[in-house]
Regions:
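Surface/interface-facing alpha-helical segments and adjacent flexible terminal/loop regions used
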Residues: 1-150
């Protein structure tokens, strides 16, 4: 959106990630909170990727996070799959069409999160990542992770 006053779920996840990453519990008041949980876990995956790959340039980070979001070999699990970290919080897809729709939606969330997160992690013109943001790469929200390998 062009309106700086407009805040969507991605902006909200970035804003509330740091204070919430320290908690093992998260009160779910509605469907948006479930999406926030997924995005918090994905932010952690992004930060781990930047830290582990020793990425020090914004362009390189952009390429890495785009690859991470789109990489089908990573097989980001969706609700209903055994590896999904919160099986009881999300309703699994009822059929193949819902499965495909959910995969596409979550992939779009991951792509947009990567784009916006890079702007926060690489805030300065020197191109170096914010150590303050990267320190959260080692934290695990609710003691869970979205994937098992990075």
């Amino acid at each position: 959106m062009d309106d700086p006053a407009y805040e969507d779920i991605i902006d909200e996840a970035i804003l509330y990630f740091r204070p919430n990453v320290f908690f093992r519990n998260f009160e779910i008041k509605g469907p948006a909170d479930r999406t926030l949980i997924y995005l918090f876990l994905y932010i952690t995956e992004c930060l781990k990727r930047i830290l582990q790959q020793k990425i020090v340039q914004k362009l390189q980070a952009s390429k890495e996070l785009t690859t991470l979001a789109l990489d089908s070999r990573r097989g980001f699990p969706i609700p209903g799959e055994q590896a999904f970290p919160f099986p009881s919080l999300f309703k699994p897809p009822a059929n193949a069409q819902e499965d495909e729709t959910m995969r596409a939606y979550l992939q779009q969330l991951r792509q947009e999160m990567g784009v916006r997160l890079i702007e926060r992690v690489f805030p300065n013109s020197d191109g170096m990542p914010s150590k303050w943001w990267l320190c959260f790469a080692k934290r695990r929200f609710m003691d869970k992770q979205l994937t098992h390998t990075i």
